[in-house]
């Protein structure tokens, strides 16, 4: 049986290489011919910046797909007799618009909630009207964006009557922000963090970023930094703590700025976010005093330093006084409380004294303003939270690492019930922290996975929202492409498909696959995108399947793209060899139905999907993805060429893990039984794994700069195949 598996693995690798070689030679994916379409007039509420943004984006899209001219006009300019083709973007409070819609035969608009919208079409006397009516300014903006997507995916004539409302109320980005060498985020050491110090102080970056995430249906931007207060506020009595200028990770001055100019900068960012319907939150960890250690006040990270408590409490109050557009603050009762880290009662009292009282101080001055507060549910116990923080007049939510650090593992992770739902009150809302410390490089795209993840969020009012992001990566501008633009491409644009899925499907998990295929077709100028959609989905199932088979929960322990771990646990530092794969600590993901490698080898578990069956599934997914993209010709389309390369990279990684899983199982069985045929099989499989790894390296190297420094994982050199070679040596030694 094992010999058949070896032959099967070799055949898959050989077939994959042939398909890849032929992929760019095929001409099925030629660009679709441009179509000349009718003129369109877009009427919009020009008093609302986010609606104006939507109208201008729609103008760009309609022009791109061939409508000419596309003219923008204010609602007040709408004539009694309509043009041949027109669009209306407005709020449902505009009674003249609603009356005109009904006069022209449009379906009546009912009551609409926050961010909800309806699409309506009218066709009286051959005059085609397309209407986006929002329950508020943001809903109207989303309606206009939706019409643009429909037009891009096919034709504006595909717009149909429909009512839309957000499935998840708050859909956010988790942005670990490298403010300054003196003001670090959780981990700015990687290439992505280091390269983005300059960008986060560029207003044009934030405008492009906020425009992009608004179109992707995100309405929350959470900015995470260990101790941002010296940058953000000047606190009475502690004025000298405020920091001027900006320094990068190496201590190089990158921008001369007074503190007042910094405040003005962040006020502009928050104003712009508000104009795109996006809330801004700041998140902090405790206890940190970065940037303020050397002042005259004696500020330290000691839990018993009363001056530190006073400074941070007053910083919280000043934060809301300084930024009227700031929605809220999130905080973590860790991970730096020294000998008090496990004293939850002490920590929660400290956090209440600082953050709770700081907010109450502000509310005394401005009782009408609602202040959001999120208490991260990490290194604590709700027993010590509820009675304290329930005193906040505007309430508070919890936050929880929904999949630990493995967003790409299972869409229905099993942890939340026992960790949160069973130990907190029925009415307690929680934000789900969707931690992606799995995929930093390759473009991912599985709509069904995202849909099921969203539908599996707890109901009964327990979901406040979600934030999507990483601890070990900065999702600002990309820093690894061999084809860089100037300025460098946004990560949200490079990974536009996955960001769109996590945003748009959070708003509407029933988003049509046909619409998504149409958007792929438009993005990459394809005649048909069905093959790309299916192949991308197949390739994107590989990493989650690997993570379910070998579930290693935290970012520092395991990075699947590099097959490595680092930092806290020396036993799993560096490349993860077959010996580490056999470590009984890392079995199949709970409730996944998969038998982990150690349990399969030992015989502890016999019911479920075996590792060898997983290996077969990985090869099948790889073969399906390669076959699907074999007829797509990228031509000179760099984005499509890199996307196809990322699909092939995931394929090669899947083939690598398929062979490695087989080799690990065979080695484990050899050690258990002493049968030499298992050892021979292990060596053969691991040689196949080495071949697959080298193919993986070639795919990555076609698009990316090698030797990236990945936070928590050190330098990733994909041409360094000493790890896969070590696996072979381990098997040879037995």
Where are these regions (language model features)?
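Bacterial N-terminal signal peptides that target proteins for export
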Residues: 1-13
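Second-shell loop/turn segments in exported
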Residues: 41-51, 130-134, 195-199, 341-344
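Aromatic-lined, polymer-binding surfaces characteristic
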Residues: 285-309, 322-330, 334-337, 344-348, ...
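Feature activates predominantly on carbohydrate-active enzymes
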Residues: 57, 61, 105-307, 324-325, ...
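Conserved, mostly hydrophobic/aromatic
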Residues: 62, 136, 213, 331, ...
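C-terminal non-catalytic alpha-helical accessory regions
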Residues: 470-474, 484-712, 716
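Catalytic-core regions of glycoside hydrolase
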Residues: 70, 75-79, 97, 176, ...
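Acidic, contiguous N-terminal accessory segments
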Residues: 11-15, 23-123, 157
């Amino acid at each position: 049986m094992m010999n058949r598996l070896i032959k099967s693995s070799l055949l898959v690798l050989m077939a994959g290489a042939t398909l890849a070689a032929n992929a760019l030679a095929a001409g099925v994916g030629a660009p679709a011919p441009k179509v000349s379409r009718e003129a369109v007039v877009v009427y919009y509420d020009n008093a609302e910046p986010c609606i104006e943004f939507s109208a201008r984006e729609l103008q760009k899209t309609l022009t791109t797909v061939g409508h000419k001219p596309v003219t923008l006009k204010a609602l007040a300019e709408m004539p009694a007799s309509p043009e041949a083709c027109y669009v209306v973007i407005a709020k449902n409070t505009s009674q003249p618009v609603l009356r005109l819609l009904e006069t022209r035969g449009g379906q009546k608009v009912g009551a609409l909630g926050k961010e909800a919208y309806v699409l309506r079409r009218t066709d009286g006397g051959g005059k085609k009207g397309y209407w986006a009516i929002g329950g508020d300014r943001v809903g109207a903006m989303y309606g206009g964006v939706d019409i643009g997507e429909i037009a891009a995916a096919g034709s504006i004539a595909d717009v149909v009557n429909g009512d839309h409302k957000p499935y998840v109320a708050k859909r956010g980005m988790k942005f670990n922000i490298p403010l300054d060498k003196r003001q670090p985020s959780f981990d700015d050491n990687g290439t992505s963090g280091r390269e983005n110090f300059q960008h986060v102080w560029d207003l044009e970056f934030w405008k492009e970023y906020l425009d992009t995430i608004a179109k992707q249906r995100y309405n929350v931007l959470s900015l995470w930094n260990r101790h941002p207060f010296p940058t953000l506020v000047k606190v009475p009595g502690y004025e000298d703590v405020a920091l001027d200028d900006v320094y990068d990770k190496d201590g190089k001055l990158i921008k001369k700025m007074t503190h007042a100019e910094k405040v003005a900068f962040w006020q502009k960012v928050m104003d712009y976010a508000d104009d795109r319907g996006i809330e801004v939150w700041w998140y902090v960890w405790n206890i940190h005093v970065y940037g303020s250690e050397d002042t005259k006040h004696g500020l330290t990270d000691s839990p018993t330093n009363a001056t530190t408590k006073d400074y941070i409490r007053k910083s919280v109050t000043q934060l809301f006084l300084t930024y009227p557009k700031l929605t809220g603050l999130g905080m973590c009762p860790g991970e730096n409380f020294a000998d008090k880290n496990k004293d939850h009662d002490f920590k929660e009292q400290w956090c209440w004294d600082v953050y709770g009282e700081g907010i109450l101080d502000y509310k005394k001055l401005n009782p009408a303003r609602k202040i959001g507060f999120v208490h991260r549910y990490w290194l604590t116990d709700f027993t010590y939270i509820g009675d304290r923080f329930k005193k906040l007049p505007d309430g508070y939510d919890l936050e929880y690492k929904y999949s630990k650090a493995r967003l790409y593992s299972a869409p229905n992770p099993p942890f939340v019930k026992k960790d949160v739902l069973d130990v907190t009150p029925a009415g307690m809302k929680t934000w789900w922290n969707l931690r992606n410390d799995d995929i930093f490089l390759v473009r991912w795209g599985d709509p069904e996975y995202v849909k099921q993840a969203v539908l599996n969020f707890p109901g009964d009012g327990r979901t406040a929202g979600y934030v999507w992001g990483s601890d070990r990566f900065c999702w600002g501008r990309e820093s690894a492409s061999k084809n860089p633009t100037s300025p460098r491409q946004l990560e949200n644009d490079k990974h536009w498909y996955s960001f769109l899925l996590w945003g748009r499907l959070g708003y509407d998990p029933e988003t049509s696959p046909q619409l998504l295929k149409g958007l792929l077709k438009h993005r990459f100028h394809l005649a048909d995108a069905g093959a790309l959609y299916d192949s991308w989905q197949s390739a994107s199932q590989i990493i989650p399947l690997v993570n379910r088979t070998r579930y290693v929960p935290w970012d520092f322990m395991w990075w699947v793209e590099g097959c490595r771990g680092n930092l806290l646990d020396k036993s799993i530092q560096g490349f993860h060899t077959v010996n580490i794969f056999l470590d009984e600590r890392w079995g199949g993901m709970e409730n996944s139905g998969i038998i982990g490698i150690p349990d399969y080898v030992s015989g502890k578990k016999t019911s479920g999907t075996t590792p060898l069956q997983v290996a077969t599934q990985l090869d099948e997914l790889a073969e399906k993805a390669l076959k699907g993209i074999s007829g797509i010709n990228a031509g000179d389309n760099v984005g499509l060429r890199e996307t196809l390369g990322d699909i092939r990279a995931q394929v090669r990684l899947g083939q690598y893990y398929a062979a490695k899983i087989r080799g690990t199982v065979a080695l484990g069985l050899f050690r258990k039984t002493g049968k030499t045929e298992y050892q021979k099989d292990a060596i053969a499989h691991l040689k196949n794994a080495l071949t697959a790894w080298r193919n993986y390296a070639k795919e990555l190297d076609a698009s990316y700069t090698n030797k990236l420094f990945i936070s928590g994982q050190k330098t990733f050199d994909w041409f360094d195949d000493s790890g896969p070679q070590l696996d072979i040596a381990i098997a040879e030694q037995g």
